[in-house]
């Protein structure tokens, strides 16, 4: 009996995959594809037309991972799911509908070049070989065990189009041999070597910009990677756009500055190393396809002309980052990190400046004292002026959720919604701080941004107003994203470090847990452990968290656009009791220990005695950080003991200043 398959496919390689299944005797129960985008240059074969000609049911749902589609696919009872250049990630519940497994054909030699547009990326990077890989699909994109691979040699004359044709042929050959063996259970699987994995994001037309300060070889590779039918490599010439379709490298640059025209026949441009001959191109997106000398004439170029983008002695404009809540824990550390990089200029607003005094003399740091609920004109102007917006203003301490729930809603939701709408109005990128609290009482072992349920308690437990305010904003931002808003949501998991809070905040109960514990040590009062202190959290060093956030701002290859990213350290899981015990150990060994009273012990306390009846806690909160690894190439590195030590030292020195002031 033939094996039954459900197929997810698009593009020429999608057609090749379907044809291979038909030729090797598989029964295709249904095919899922994408509707063609009229804005794309559709140079490839149509999966929908192929299915129509072969009488195969074909669908193009907006979301194949929707429970209704998963239910329909499950009723087909497929032996296998196959993905051939389908553009969307398939969820674990969908993958589980296949009795014998789900498999993807990827256009590279995994684990190299995971992600989007691998055929273009290998050309951009000057690789001499690539290939195709048949691998098992798992939760993480392109990370499953490998069943078969076939290499493809990349010639210097290859372009994105010719390489794609080679990959299509390689896919047909690989599937012709592998599919019968798969049906017979004869294909062995080999786990990918994660240490060799590389990931590349999607490419956009803007990535084709020619930067003449780079070596000519790099520009040559860019040209052939994005030449027709792709949008092309380009630069500016006066008020016009020069699109380069074919080029070659010539040794030497005659000692001229990058971007200067060495000659117009041939049209030869000096680069940072060697020079690039433009063989064919056009003026603007709607111009005629011309040879280099004719193109130079049309653009008015002469020997010695300078193409825009050449080094002119003027640095490119810094990226302007607006941080609302700049004096807060994340805001002040992030500002410090960005100011170490000359590419950024930071504009900040907050109601105080004690944590950023060290930054105020920096020439690229601009601070205004103000309140987001009052200084609306200043905020709207600066959102319009800046490139990236981080609205970090929020009430984020549990005691306030129960004693001031309306204030939490007004600030955390209503005021922040205004900021989001300004970003929509002026088409600005917003990086919004969601929270690990949105997962609520989720029962998953690891909280996943894309699949975990967000579970909160009853209405009379007011502690959830912070969680649902943030969650609702997440959903609003996601909806605006569907209409064009460029956003990233990041979810911090228990970040700790210097300048986390103030001891005075702990004195009124409005602080994070570690600050409260340190205050108990400093004042010689018992450390209160609510409900036994058995609640587990994953504590993340502020340096690790800020590095991840800086990479989100950098946004290499636009990988973070429209993404939700947990930022936490699952290896640093500990209960609040264990946190207190480690604090005590380091406190007793600290050089300043002699300035403080004796330890008063641990005391178990009911949480409602402190937080009130509106409080409800969660037993654990552990993040999945696969998105952060994949999108940011980031992993946390700081152990919890080091984070605790740095945080403790900061607060003990603050306490010493208080003691000195009293004297």
Swiss-Prot record:
Disulfide bonds: none annotated. The keyword Oxidoreductase applies. Its EC number is 2.1.2.13, 1.1.1.305. UDP-alpha-D-glucuronate binds at residues 396, 401, 435-436, 463, 494, 528-537, 615. The active site is at 106 (proton donor), 437 (proton acceptor), 621 (proton donor). Keywords: Antibiotic resistance, Lipid A biosynthesis, Lipid biosynthesis, Lipid metabolism, Lipopolysaccharide biosynthesis, Multifunctional enzyme, NAD, Oxidoreductase, Transferase. It catalyses: UDP-alpha-D-glucuronate + NAD(+) = UDP-beta-L-threo-pentopyranos-4-ulose + CO2 + NADH; UDP-4-amino-4-deoxy-beta-L-arabinose + (6R)-10-formyltetrahydrofolate = UDP-4-deoxy-4-formamido-beta-L-arabinose + (6S)-5,6,7,8-tetrahydrofolate + H(+). GO terms for molecular function: carboxy-lyase activity; UDP-4-amino-4-deoxy-L-arabinose formyltransferase activity; UDP-glucuronate dehydrogenase activity. The keyword Lipid biosynthesis applies. Residues 1-307 are annotated as: Formyltransferase ArnAFT. The record marks 104 as: Transition state stabilizer. Pathway: Nucleotide-sugar biosynthesis; UDP-4-deoxy-4-formamido-beta-L-arabinose biosynthesis; UDP-4-deoxy-4-formamido-beta-L-arabinose from UDP-alpha-D-glucuronate: step 1/3; Nucleotide-sugar biosynthesis; UDP-4-deoxy-4-formamido-beta-L-arabinose biosynthesis; UDP-4-deoxy-4-formamido-beta-L-arabinose from UDP-alpha-D-glucuronate: step 3/3; Bacterial outer membrane biogenesis; lipopolysaccharide biosynthesis. One of its GO terms (cellular component) is membrane. (6R)-10-formyltetrahydrofolate binds at residues 116, 138-142. The record marks 142 as: Raises pKa of active site His. SUPFAM superfamilies: FMT C-terminal domain-like, Formyltransferase, NAD(P)-binding Rossmann-fold domains. Homohexamer, formed by a dimer of trimers. Bifunctional enzyme that catalyzes the oxidative decarboxylation of UDP-glucuronic acid (UDP-GlcUA) to UDP-4-keto-arabinose (UDP-Ara4O) and the addition of a formyl group to UDP-4-amino-4-deoxy-L-arabinose (UDP-L-Ara4N) to form UDP-L-4-formamido-arabinose (UDP-L-Ara4FN). The modified arabinose is attached to lipid A and is required for resistance to polymyxin and cationic antimicrobial peptides. This is Bifunctional polymyxin resistance protein ArnA. It comes from Pseudomonas fluorescens (strain SBW25).
């Amino acid at each position: 009996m033939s094996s039954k398959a459900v197929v997810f496919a698009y593009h020429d390689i999608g057609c090749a995959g379907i044809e291979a299944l038909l030729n090797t005797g598989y029964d295709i129960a249904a095919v899922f594809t994408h509707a063609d985008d009229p804005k794309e240059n559709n140079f490839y074969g149509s999966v929908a037309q192929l299915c129509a000609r072969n009488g195969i049911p074909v669908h193009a749902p907006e979301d194949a991972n929707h429970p209704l589609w998963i239910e329909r696919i499950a009723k087909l009872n497929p032996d296998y799911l196959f993905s051939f250049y389908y553009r969307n990630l398939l969820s674990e519940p969908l993958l589980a509908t296949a009795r014998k497994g789900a498999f993807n054909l990827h256009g590279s030699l995994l684990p190299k070049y995971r992600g989007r547009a691998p055929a273009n990326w290998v050309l951009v990077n000057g690789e001499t070989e690539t290939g195709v890989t048949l691998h098992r699909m798992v939760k993480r994109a392109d990370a499953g065990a490998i069943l078969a691979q076939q290499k493809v040699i990349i010639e210097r004359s290859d372009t994105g189009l010719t390489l794609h044709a080679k990959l299509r042929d390689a896919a047909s050959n690989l599937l012709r041999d592998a599919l019968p063996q798969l049906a017979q259970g004869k294909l062995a699987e080999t786990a990918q070597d994660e240490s060799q994995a590389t990931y590349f994001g999607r490419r956009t037309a803007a990535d084709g910009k020619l930067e003449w300060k780079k070596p000519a070889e790099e520009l040559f590779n860019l040209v052939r990677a994005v030449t027709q039918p792709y949008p092309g490599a380009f630069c500016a010439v006066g008020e016009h756009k020069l699109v380069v379709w074919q080029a070659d490298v010539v040794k030497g640059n005659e000692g001229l500055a990058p971007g200067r025209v060495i000659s117009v026949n041939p049209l030869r441009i000096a680069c940072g190393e060697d020079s690039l001959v433009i063989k064919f191109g056009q003026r603007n997106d709607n111009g005629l396809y011309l040879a280099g000398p004719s193109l130079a004439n049309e653009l008015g170029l002469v020997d010695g002309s300078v193409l825009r983008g050449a080094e002119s002695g003027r640095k490119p404009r810094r990226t302007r980052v607006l941080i609302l809540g700049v004096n807060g824990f994340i805001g002040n550390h992030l500002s410090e990190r960005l100011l170490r990089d000359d590419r950024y200029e930071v504009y900040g607003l907050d109601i105080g400046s004690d944590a950023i005094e060290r930054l105020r003399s920096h020439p690229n740091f601009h601070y205004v004292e103000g309140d987001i609920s009052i200084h609306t004109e200043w905020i709207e102007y600066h959102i319009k002026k800046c490139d990236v917006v981080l609205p970090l203003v929020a009430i984020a301490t549990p005691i306030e959720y129960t004693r001031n729930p309306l204030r939490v809603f007004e600030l955390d939701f209503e005021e922040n919604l205004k900021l989001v709408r300004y970003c929509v109005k002026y088409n600005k990128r917003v990086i919004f701080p969601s929270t690990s609290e949105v997962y609520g009482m989720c029962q998953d072992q690891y909280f996943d941004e894309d699949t975990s349920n967000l579970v909160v308690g009853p209405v009379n437990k007011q502690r959830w107003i912070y969680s649902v305010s943030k969650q609702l904003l997440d959903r609003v931002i996601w909806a605006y994203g569907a209409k064009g808003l460029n956003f990233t949501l990041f979810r911090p998991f228990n970040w700790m470090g210097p300048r986390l809070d103030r001891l005075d905040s702990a004195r009124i109960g409005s602080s994070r847990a570690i600050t409260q514990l340190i205050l108990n040590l400093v004042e010689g009062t018992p450390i209160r452990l609510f409900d036994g202190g058995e609640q587990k959290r994953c504590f993340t060093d502020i340096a690790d968290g800020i590095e991840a956030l800086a990479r989100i701002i950098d946004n290499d290859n636009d990988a973070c656009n429209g993404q939700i990213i947990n930022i936490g350290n699952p290896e640093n899981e500990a209960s609040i009791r264990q946190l207190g015990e480690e604090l005590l150990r380091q406190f007793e060994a600290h050089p300043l220990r002699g300035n403080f009273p004796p330890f008063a012990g641990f005391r178990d306390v009911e949480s409602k005695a402190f937080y009130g009846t509106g409080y409800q806690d969660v037993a654990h909160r552990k993040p999945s950080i696969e998105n952060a690894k994949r999108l940011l190439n980031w992993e946390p590195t700081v152990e919890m003991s080091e984070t605790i030590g740095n945080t403790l030292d900061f607060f003990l020195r603050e306490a010493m200043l208080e003691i000195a002031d009293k004297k």
